[in-house]
Amino acid sequence: MRLIKLEQPNCNPCKMVSNYLEQVNIQFETVDVTQEPEVAARFGVMGVPVTILLSDQGEEVNRSVGFKPNELDELLKELR
């Protein structure tokens, strides 16, 4: 499984999610929705940040919207 974070420049909650994931030493991919709007459309993302856990086949398993440490912890449990 893999974790992706959809964000845009100058988004403070996006930075908070990145910092949180980096503190717990989790690898994740970052997608700038202003540069790759097709990714946001694929996952039906209307606002950022959105952190999505994907299966090995690329299917969405779970997601967290905004900076919510409890939701992020749930994603991380599923990732491990």
Curated annotation (Swiss-Prot):
SUPFAM superfamilies with a match to the protein in the record: Thioredoxin-like (SSF52833)
Superkingdom, taxonomy of origin: Bacteria
InterPro entries: Thioredoxin-like_sf (IPR036249), Thioredoxin_domain (IPR013766)
Segments forming domain Thioredoxin: 1-80
UniProt entry keywords in alphabetical sequence: Disulfide bond, Redox-active center
Disulfide bonds: 11-14
Keyword Disulfide bond part of the UniProt annotation: yes
Coiled-coil residues: none
Family per record: Belongs to the thioredoxin family.
Protein name: SPbeta prophage-derived thioredoxin-like protein YosR
Gene: yosR
